[in-house]
Amino acid sequence: MGLTLIDAGVLIGFLDRTDAHHAASYDALTGALDRNDRIVLPASAYGEALVGPSRRGSKAVTVVEQLVERVPIEIEPLSQAIARTAAMIRAKHRSIRLPDALVIATAKELDADLLVTTDHGWPTRAKLGLRATITRL
């Protein structure tokens, strides 16, 4: 049993069957469940994933909330340590936006085994100083 951390794109892809990342997101989440991994989503990424459903209304938001509860996906709050690590990542890697730095920092602070993202622009795990394997969908 390990810890799989997902970014917003994975949850968005899982929820939207028309999304280019749907099948890969589905496989990533079911794989984590099959391994009995804890699945964690940073609170910042959860907020990002709720933007589209929020535009569609409260019922769409409820669908996401129910999925998160059923899977279950743990929502990791933004802590001072995560914020500090994200700032250091952002300062060192100028191409990484703050939302992505928060996801990476959460993986680092939680010592995740696997970080699943739809972003292909991130530096390697070695350059990021991560123990986690990065899976890019």
State where each predicted segment sits.
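Alpha-helix capping/helix-boundary segments
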Residues: V10, A45, I82, L102-V103, ...
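Acidic catalytic patch
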Residues: R17, S44, P72-H93
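Short beta-strand scaffold positions
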Residues: I6, V40-L41, P77, L98, ...
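Short, hinge-like loop/turn segments at secondary-structure boundaries
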Residues: R56-A60, H93-R94, A132-T135
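Short active-site oxyanion
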Residues: R35-I39, P72-E74, L110-L114
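Short, well-structured N-terminal submotif of metal-dependent ribonuclease cores
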Residues: M1-L41, P53-Q66
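Acidic, PIN/NYN-like endoribonuclease modules and their adjacent C-terminal/linker elements
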Residues: M1-L3, I104-L137
